[in-house]
């Protein structure tokens, strides 16, 4: 009976896929053991062909953040396992340690331990003494469970902070922002602000930061995409909410394809339509919808930088609800700069 139900469910999902012409992936990664959710692209500046795609795999006991090479193969020695429900992941470049050396970092939410984790890349060493607790001032356990995370590097001073969302939260102050600082005692995480409105419907998971333009966007899943200033110094007032009318139901993962100046696109998963909506980076106006073949996409990431001969003009990565991730050469999306 369970087999029949599973087949019925898969047939139903396929039948409900977007009727847009499908753009086939360049490749599909190896499968993870449990439940994929969110990817992040780390660019190896010295050798782009050795760049790594990190992807979360959710499980309360044996979850992981898996590292993939550009052929979609799992790199076991760079993967983190036995993680308690890793949800979303992001990367940043040039975090300054106490001795003035710098390292790239990987940050992910560990939902069941109510914390975020910080690792150096590419050596994959923990910098957080086991994790930084988040939403500590909340009494409700549900409001302590982190989901989304995105990193902001202030282009003016190089300071790095993480913006974190959660499974449940209030109508205002849903997101917390934590600054990462390093001193002789190690790396620390300091709460610097609470901000962000919530409709009260569904939840907030997906977050993305446009470092260069100084904005943070997040998906209030049932109503629209909310936009704020990424720097606390510019205040907590909402700039806009947009795009909700272009989604079938859940508004999910967000990625930003950045080109020179303010050109580029916000790419947002329309989860139940199994498609992606594109919005102008400069005006946030709707541009187009694409079907990239994925099912029930949660998270996605994109880079417009060249990653060797296979992805000379960039790469788009999206989670697929079959324990894997899809890689699309950015050329195949046919988005004009």
Model feature map: region roles:
Residues 70-114:
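Blade-loop segments of beta-propeller domains
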Residues 35-49, 87-102, 145-160, 201-214, ...:
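Structural signature of eukaryotic scaffold interfaces centered on beta-propeller domains
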Residues 246-286:
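Loop/turn-rich, solvent-exposed surfaces of beta-rich toroidal or solenoidal domains
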């Amino acid at each position: 009976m369970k087999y029949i139900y599973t087949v019925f469910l898969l047939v139903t999902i396929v039948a409900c896929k977007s009727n847009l012409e499908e753009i086939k992936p360049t490749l599909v990664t190896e499968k993870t053991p449990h439940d994929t959710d969110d990817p992040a692209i780390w660019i190896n500046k010295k050798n782009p062909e050795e760049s790594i795609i990190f992807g979360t795999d959710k499980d309360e006991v044996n979850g992981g953040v898996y590292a993939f090479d550009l052929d979609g193969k799992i790199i076991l020695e760079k993967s983190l396992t036995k993680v308690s429900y890793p949800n979303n992941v992001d990367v940043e470049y040039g975090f300054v340690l106490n001795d003035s050396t710098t390292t790239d970092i990987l940050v992910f939410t560990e939902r069941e331990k109510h914390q975020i984790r910080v690792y150096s890349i590419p050596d994959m060493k923990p910098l957080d003494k086991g994790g930084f607790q988040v939403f500590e001032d909340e009494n409700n356990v549900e409001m302590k469970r982190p989901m989304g995370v995105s990193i902001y590097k202030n282009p003016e001073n190089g300071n790095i902070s993480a913006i974190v969302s959660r499974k449940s939260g209030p109508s205002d102050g849903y997101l917390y922002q934590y600054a990462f600082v390093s001193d002789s005692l190690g790396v620390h995480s300091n709460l610097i602000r609470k901000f962000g409105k919530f409709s009260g419907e569904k939840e907030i998971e997906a977050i993305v930061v446009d470092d260069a333009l100084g904005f943070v966007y997040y998906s209030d899943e049932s109503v629209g995409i909310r936009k704020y200033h990424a720097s606390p110094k510019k205040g907590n007032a909402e700039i806009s909410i947009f795009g909700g009318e272009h989604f079938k139901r859940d508004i999910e993962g967000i990625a930003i394809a950045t080109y020179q100046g303010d050109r580029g696109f916000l790419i947002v998963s329309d989860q139940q339509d199994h498609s992606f909506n594109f919005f102008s980076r400069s005006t946030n106006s709707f541009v187009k919808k694409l079907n990239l073949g994925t099912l029930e996409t949660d998270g996605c990431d994109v880079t417009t930088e060249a990653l060797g001969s296979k992805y000379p003009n960039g790469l788009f990565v999206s989670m697929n609800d079959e324990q894997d991730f899809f890689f699309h050469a950015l050329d195949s999306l046919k988005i004009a700069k």
